[in-house]
Each structure stands twice: as structure tokens, then as C-alpha cells.
Amino acid sequence: MKFAYRFSNLLGTVYRRGNLNFTCDGNSVISPVGNRVTVFDLKNNKSDTLPLATRYNVKCVGLSPDGRLAIIVDEGGDALLVSLVCRSVLHHFHFKGSVHSVSFSPDGRKFVVTKGNIAQMYHAPGKKREFNAFVLDKTYFGPYDETTCIDWTDDSRCFVVGSKDMSTWVFGAERWDNLIYYALGGHKDAIVACFFESNSLDLYSLSQDGVLCMWQCDTPPEGLRLKPPAGWKADLLQREQEEEEEEGDRETTIRGKATPAEEEKTGKVKYSRLAKYFFNKEGDFNNLTAAAFHKKSHLLVTGFASGIFHLHELPEFNLIHSLSISDQSIASVAINSSGDWIAFGCSGLGQLLVWEWQSESYVLKQQGHFNSMVALAYSPDGQYIVTGGDDGKVKVWNTLSGFCFVTFTEHSSGVTGVTFTATGYVVVTSSMDGTVRAFDLHRYRNFRTFTSPRPTQFSCVAVDASGEIVSAGAQDSFEIFVWSMQTGRLLDVLSGHEGPISGLCFNPMKSILASASWDKTERLWDMFDSWRTKETLALTSDALAVTFRPDGAELAVATLNSQITFWDPENAVQTGSIEGRHHLKTGRKELDKITAKHAAKGKAFTTLCYSADGQSILAGGMSKFVCIYHVREQILMKRFEISCNLSLDAMEEFLNRRKMTEFGNLALIDQDAGQEDGVAIPLPGVRKGDMSSRHFKPEIRVTSLRFSPTGRCWAATTTEGLLIFSLDTRVLFDPFELDTSITPGRVREALRQQDFTRAILMALRLNESKLVQEALEAVPSGEIEVVTSSLPELYVEKVLEFLASSFEVSRHLEFYLLWTHRLLMLHGQKLKSRAGTLLPVIQFLQKSIQRHLDDLSKLCSWNRYNMQYALAVSKQRGTKRSLDPLGSEEEAEASEDDSLHLLGGGGRDSEEGMLAES
């Protein structure tokens, strides 16, 4: 159970590329993030990443009208049919080409994909089990260039497709007699979006140069006639239909022409252009990049390359308002079902914004790190994660909601290290700009800035257990600087290393600082002995990372030769080592001239972290794998693959030999480069950053790893973002001291006999959460103390761990608080003797209770202030203010408190009762 971690959420990245979608209720946004999809619940303020991944970056997402199914298509043309209800993959399909967009029909029976210069219509998967969920119905030809956008009529009879050849094509979903296809021109640039009017065949088309054309149809939707068969064609058609019913997979091809024949024009549907509007006025050349149209309110939203968006009312083209929301191009726009919220995605900076246009306020405003993340740290209670990136920003994330609630931008260069103090309210960061800064999470400000006498670049930072001493290692001067948190003064400069400082770590229990350097040494510094070198540990290679065990009795060091060595800091003796070269499994980059096997000799672990109990260690580095080792046995317990995204570099061990030519690798030729801003050439020798090009494949790597203090999850900063892996107790069956006589039936039989202690013990041995919940909730509140006193000490820890996990999902707050209080009061002394092993469980319990305390305290304070205000207003109603005050302010406050207690009906006891009821 300890190693059964699974991917649970993706933080740090909110949008990459692709189209945004609102769910049917309009309260959630579905955003593609790399090769994953994240759902942002705007009503409950929570984000959740689906537990699935595509082989390449997601390019487009199509949502069914009922909101239960989604089709996710990646850059390689592979599609996943996903159930949003059970969050699982139902079907895999390959479209054999790059797909630009996908759209379901309003009735949910069919969907259309634009692939190359054609549009293909498929039968949507039904509710019954099918061998092939995607059955091709028709293929539509006509455009000469790539098709870009799709829109359906409300009755699902027709759909319109826009193309890069500046034409718009209207196709019939059925065999209509008066409408097979219709080509519309009128534009001088590629079509970005096209939309039908509500319950009409009238449509709007928008091009990239900022031109809107309004087209009127002379036929209503009810005027479409099915094409009747005649003569021998009817017999042939009937025979073909019978064959289609037998085979079930035959498709129809419809080929359109830009200039139809004269006999095809008679009695057909005709379009005429009513108006033509221009967004760019007076020579303002601003490319239109995205658009969305709400049919019920006739609201048109357009996004431009400069980060500006316009709101217009159609068909009058009245400008409602215009606003600049970003410095980068707007890549995607979506409107929810009610038409109140508008979602914008900016792929340049990775921004996701939800704007309420009527109140002109933000519902959601999130942005990830522009460049890769470098460091992360958990708060002591495990509720928050702080990350630092190469863009110089420091972000604090809430692990429960998945949102970033504060961003610090004081650093002017890349952040190299972040850490929390023991209180959890101060974040200390180091940067390449030569400063170490301390941030206050109460007031969200930078209250301390530590600098060195001479400008230097800091590569790492550490804070002692008391939070009074701050130390940072220099990359260029090979020195360690020590400051006081209270005064901000420089206390000492520690010299002795002959290479850049790669890592610092304080002993959690003693005043000892460990420093790792590229000079193949590890030094221990004594804080109370004038910062003298206590020990110098000689290593076999350059040190890259260092960490202490939570109890401070062991030290782990990662070196450049892919080894992890363990040391006893008291006696300066090596206690063990792990050879991790074969566990990294590095891949071959597309620019590598050597194989992955030879390239692995230069790869190593760059980050280490002990688990909460200290029995295992987490290691990651220049690879797509994260390894968990057992410290005592020195063996690999499990290896986690952090990504399967082939859009990243160094993912595969062998390159495709068919792409290897005498001029180099054909995969390096970017097909999408040069479409908007021309061909961008990467700078030579650049290993990280934006590479001077927006079209490059970043290399997969793990830059930082941290275990949660609760021991239930661990986080990793990677090229994909901030990944969180946690224990999923709902799927796994992990019994504890199981016997053949213990069954769920025996547990329920003991509950019927009111033998609660035996029922709880058997349920804990089965270790099924629902059965344990049933056994605990069957105990009357008056007998909780009797049952807890008869529980063996071994099972108290199991009950506390279950209570901690139940606080997050259960509504029985007072009942579980009674269980927690009785267990800690009756077994507190015995549990204290095993404080080291029980620390993760206690921290997990504290985190869950603290979250409820924060939520309820805000609610109760709000209600209390409202009642005080209502009482004050009721006293002043109908009376004039007198010149002389009736009494002192203290008497007035006391009278208000008395009135409030009378209203509550019993003072503090009643308030506690109200808390328990809520």
C-alpha cells in the first residue's frame, strides 16, 4: 500500500493549446494541458485532471451535448473516447492524419472531424456496447486547403466548414434534394470561425484578417427536402441500403465543386451576402485568432493576436465592449450555456481566464510558469505547495483546490530554491539575481531581502528547524552565506568548498548544516561551534543533491555517477549505497549523435527526498522515471513514469531509422513553423528556457521531488508541470492480518448483535473503507468512549488514519470529532511513545481538521457580523441620533454581545451547537 501511488492531479499548468469547452451546466471549463485534460470547477473552486493521457499533445476536444462523452484528439491523430462520468477511456481510434477540430451534432447522434482538406462525419457512439464505436458515415470533399472550423445547425440537418483557402462550405448531413453542398467566398484570408444563426440556415464567417461576412439563406431549415430515388437508381439504392445494413460500415463520399453546374442550381438553396464588417480600422493590422458565438443572446466574442477581445451584438454589429486581457495571442474562446461567462486561453504564456462580461469581472484568472519549474516545497501541514521557476516567479498552490492563490514577482531572474519555515507562514526563496527573499503568506508581501557583500548567484537555500537561520549556497564564489531571519543581517560566510554549491539541508533535530558541492565533498557545519566544519565526507563523484532523514539520523547524497550514498552524520561513516544508473532508463534525444545506452553514462539523479516515515527515499533526475528505493534493503521498490508524451524530447530509447537521412533527422523539421511569425532558429548551446523559438521539443526531466508531510502523496516538478501522485484507497484491496473467518457478512452480523468492538476490528482487518465507515457510524455516540477504550493499540493508528481521510469527504463532522477526541485522550500517552512513526498520520489528521476549522470559522464570523449589523440597524430604526452618546463604546459592544447571545439562545454553548449542526 505504501508504494501504490497513482497520478491524482496536475498543477502549475492550466492551458497549453487546443480548444476550450464549457460543460452543459456552464459551471466547469475543460482545458487541454499538454497530453492531459483538466476540468476546472468554477462553482466549487476546484480543479481536477482526468486520469488519462494521450501519446502526443492534445490538439482538440469535442464534448457531447449531454456532457457525458468527450472525444480527445492529439497531434498525431489518435483519438480517445472518454466517459466524463466514470473518468475512464472507452475507445481508442486513429484518424490516420492530423485533425484540426471535432464537433458533435446538437442531437448527439453524429460528429464531424476536419482532417486535411476534407470533413468526415461519423456515427456517434450509442449507449449499447459496440465493437467499433466510430463508424464512418460520409466524407465531404470541396476545400482545396486545410479545413479549420465546424458548426452545426440547431436541428442537426446541416453543418458548415471553414477552410484556409478562404472559402466556407455548407454541407447537408442527409441526402437533401435542394442542398448537397454550397461554397461561399468573400474573404481574403483563412477562415477562423463560422457560425449558424439560431433555427436558421443564415450564417456568419470570420477570417484571419478581421473581416465578418453575414450570409442570408432563402430557404428555412424546414424547406430542406430529402432526395427521392427514381427508376433503376431506386432499385440500386435499395440494394445498396440492404448491403449497408448487412455490413454496417460502408461510407458515402460527397465531392463538391466551387462552381456547380447549371442543372444543379435550379430549385436549390441560395445564399446572398447581407453585410460585411471590418474589425481592423484605420490600418490597424491585428490578426483575428479565435471566435465564439452564443446563438440565444446573439453575442459574438472575438480574440486577437494582440491579446484584445471584442464583444459584439449581431446582426447589428454593435460593440458592447473591448478589453485587453493579455500581452499574448488569444488561442481559444468559449462561451458557457447561459452566455454569462467567457473563457479565454492564451498559449503563449499558458493563461486561462474566465470573464463575466455583464459585471466586467474575472471568475477565474490562472497562469502557470512561463518557463520550466525548478523547485518545490510542501508546507508543514501539507495544504500548500510553493514552486519556483526559470521565469523568476514564485507561486503558492492549494493542494485541495489545485489553484494558485498568490504569485510573487520580486525576483528578476530564475528561482533556484524554495522552502517553508516550520510555522508554514513564511516562504524563503533563492535566485540567480543574487538575492534570497522571505515572503509572508499572511500579508502576501516580501518582508526580508538577504544579499551578499559581493554580487553572486545563489543556487540553493535552506532554513533551520526554528526558522531563525537562513543559509544559501553560491554558484560562482563557492561560499555559503548565513543570515538571521529576525534582523536580516549577514551572520557568517562559510568557505571551504572548491566548487559550486549544489545543495543545502539542515538537520531537523540538531543544529547541523549539510552542504553538497561539485568538488566531490560533503561538509557538515556545526551551528553552535562558530560554524566550524564538523566533518568532511569524501565522495566518488560530484555531489548533486543532499537530504536528511526526518529524524536526522541519516544523510543521503546523490552524485554524478548515478549513485545514492547513505551516511551516518554522527560518526561520518557510510552506511550504504544504491547504484541507480540502470533504473533511470534515459531516452535518446533527436539531436544526439550517440545511442541512449551511451548517453545514460552522463545522466544522474538530481533531486532526493525521504518519505515521511524515513524507510524509503524518492529519487528523480534526467529521466522520465521517478524511483522509490527501500533504504535499509537498498533495492528498487517501484518506478513511476511521469509522462508518456511523445511531443517531449528524450522519451524514446531508439529513434525511428526511417527519419534518419544524410542531412540529419527529419523529425527536427517543424511542420508548423513559419505559419505566423516565420521560421525561428534555436540558439546554439541553450539547454533550457524558450530556446529563442516557440517551436521546439523540451526535454523531459524531473527538477524537484518532495513527499507530503502526511505521507499520502508526493509531488514532482517536471517538464509537464507540477504532478501529484497519491494513494488511491478506493481501488486497492490491502487487508491487514486477514483470516479466513473474517468476511463482510461476519462484520454486519456483529453489528446486528451490537458487538461494536469486534465489528470494527474485523472491518479494519479487511481494510475496506466502506465497511469500516459502516462499522464506525453504527456505534451510538454515547458508546464511543467504551469502544475506544477497548481497542488494541495496534488498531488505534488504523482508526486515526481512516478518520483523517473521512474528514475530507464526510458530512458527519461532530461524530468523527468525538471519535478523534476520545482516541487521543484515552491512548495519547501510548501514542506519544511512537511519535516518530505516527507523525504522518497525526499531520494528515491535523490537515483535515484545520480545513474544516477554516471554512466554519469564516462562515460563523460572517454570520456573527451580519447579526451584529442587523441588531445595530434595528436599534437605530425610527429614532433620531442624539448629540450626546448614550454610553461608552465598551458598554455598547457589551450590550450588542448580550443581544447576540440572547438571539443565539445560550451564548457559547449554543454557538458550539450551531457549529456541530452545520
UniProtKB/Swiss-Prot annotation:
Residues 250-262 have a biased composition (Basic and acidic residues). GO terms for biological process: maturation of SSU-rRNA from tricistronic rRNA transcript (SSU-rRNA, 5.8S rRNA, LSU-rRNA); ribosomal small subunit assembly; ribosomal small subunit biogenesis. Residues 887-897 have a biased composition (Acidic residues). Residues 237-262, 878-918 are annotated as: Disordered. It is found in: Nucleus, Nucleolus. InterPro entries: PWP2, Quinoprotein_ADH-like_sf, SSU_processome_Utp12, WD40/YVTN_repeat-like_dom_sf, WD40_rpt. Its main location: nucleus. SMART domains: WD40 (SM00320). One of its GO terms (cellular component) is small-subunit processome. WD repeats lie at residues 12-50, 53-93, 94-132, 142-181, 186-225, 283-322, 325-365, 368-407, 410-449, 453-495, 496-535, 538-577, 600-639, 697-737. It comes from the Eukaryota. Keywords: Nucleus, Phosphoprotein, Repeat, WD repeat. Pfam families: Utp12, WD40. The modification Phosphoserine is found at S895, S899. Part of the small subunit (SSU) processome, composed of more than 70 proteins and the RNA chaperone small nucleolar RNA (snoRNA) U3. Part of the small subunit (SSU) processome, first precursor of the small eukaryotic ribosomal subunit. During the assembly of the SSU processome in the nucleolus, many ribosome biogenesis factors, an RNA chaperone and ribosomal proteins associate with the nascent pre-rRNA and work in concert to generate RNA folding, modifications, rearrangements and cleavage as well as targeted degradation of pre-ribosomal RNA by the RNA exosome. Belongs to the WD repeat PWP2 family. This is Periodic tryptophan protein 2 homolog. The lineage of its organism: Eukaryota, Metazoa, Chordata, Craniata, Vertebrata. The gene is PWP2.
